[in-house]
C-alpha cells in the first residue's frame, strides 16, 4: 500500500519518492557525465541513447529505467537550460555513485545524458563548457 500511496497523485501531489531522496542525499558522491547527446525532437536522440546504454560499459542516467526504454517521467534532464533553478548537486544526483563506477567496473564504466532541446537554447553551449570543459558531445 505504501507504493500505491506514493504513486497516486491525489495522495502525493509533490511526487515524493524514496529513490529521489536517496539520489539527493548521495549527490556529493556521484560523478558528472562523460558524454552528452545534443539532439532535437524527432531526430532519434532517444533511440541513440537507448542503443548506447545497452553496452555493458555505459551506465544510464537514473531518469532512464533498467530496460533501456523511456521512463514514465521526463527522460530528458534539461539541466543546462534551467541552471538557475537547479544546482550542480541536483544534476549529479542523476548519475552513478563514484565508488561503484570505479571499483566495480575498474574505471571502465562511463555515463552520459541526453536532452532533445539543448540544440535550441542559445546559452547551453557556454554552460556546458563552463561546467564540463572536456565533455564528449554527440
Language-model-detected regions and their locations in the chain:
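PAPS-dependent sulfotransferase catalytic core
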Residues: 1-116, 130-135
Amino acid at each position: 500500500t505504501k507504493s500505491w500511496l506514493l504513486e497516486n497523485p491525489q495522495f502525493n501531489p509533490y511526487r515524493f519518492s524514496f529513490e529521489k531522496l536517496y539520489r539527493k542525499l548521495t549527490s556529493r558522491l556521484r560523478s558528472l557525465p562523460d558524454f552528452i547527446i545534443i539532439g532535437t525532437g524527432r531526430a532519434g536522440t532517444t533511440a541513440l541513447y537507448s542503443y548506447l546504454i545497452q553496452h555493458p560499459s555505459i551506465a544510464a542516467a537514473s531518469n532512464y529505467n533498467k530496460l533501456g526504454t523511456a521512463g514514465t517521467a521526463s527522460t530528458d534532464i534539461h539541466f543546462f537550460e534551467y541552471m538557475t533553478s537547479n544546482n550542480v548537486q541536483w544534476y549529479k544526483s542523476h548519475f552513478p555513485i563514484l565508488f561503484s563506477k570505479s571499483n566495480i567496473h575498474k574505471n571502465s564504466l562511463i555515463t552520459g545524458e541526453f536532452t532533445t532541446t539543448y540544440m535550441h537554447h542559445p546559452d547551453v553551449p557556454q554552460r556546458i563548457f563552463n561546467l564540463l570543459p572536456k565533455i564528449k558531445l554527440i
